[in-house]
Amino acid sequence: RRLHKGTRALDNLQTLKWLTEAGVELKWNLLWGIPGEDPDEYRVMAELLPAIVHFAPPIAVGQVRADRFSPYFCQPAQYGIENLRPHRAFRFVYPLPDESLQRLAYYFEHDFADGRDPQHYIEPWLDAVEQWQNDHHRATLSASFQEDGALVLSDTRPCAAGFQHRLSGLERELYVYCDRGRRFGDLRHFA
């Protein structure tokens, strides 16, 4: 939501799930260094990533940029951004003075007004993403309905408690209910 694109993490996970089920080959990126983020969110995400290792991992991980004409470029102070400067790659391509590079560049680097440096808090998360990229091809999580109505989960993720889990009764009902992404509060009526 901090990128103001109208989606939540749960929506993104549901999309990964649906596209995986449909057999779509996914190519996507993961962004970090989003203005207004809570550094502790990276710790939480690093802990959760092993649970989704069966989904296609991002092909690239990169820092959010302030591109020309973007809100981060046009209204940097509103997002706690300062010191906008042309991306360092422009210096290698165009041997021009700073003023000319500033007018020419489309991609910009920046600092955060509060002094934060995301490089100092994303390392465990980056390690978890790399582990995801390494483990993905060996990990599956699938469900099959049995003739007796039970649901059998087959799980080869490294975090799996066991290879197969048989769900029936309330466990099966909860699993099926959660097939469409749900929030914890949505589960109250099962209590």
Predicted regions and their residues:
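Conserved non-cysteine loop/helix-boundary elements of the Radical SAM core domain that shape
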Residues: 1-55
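C-terminal scaffold of the Radical SAM
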Residues: 22, 39-173
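Long, charge-rich, low-complexity alpha-helical segments
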Residues: 165-191
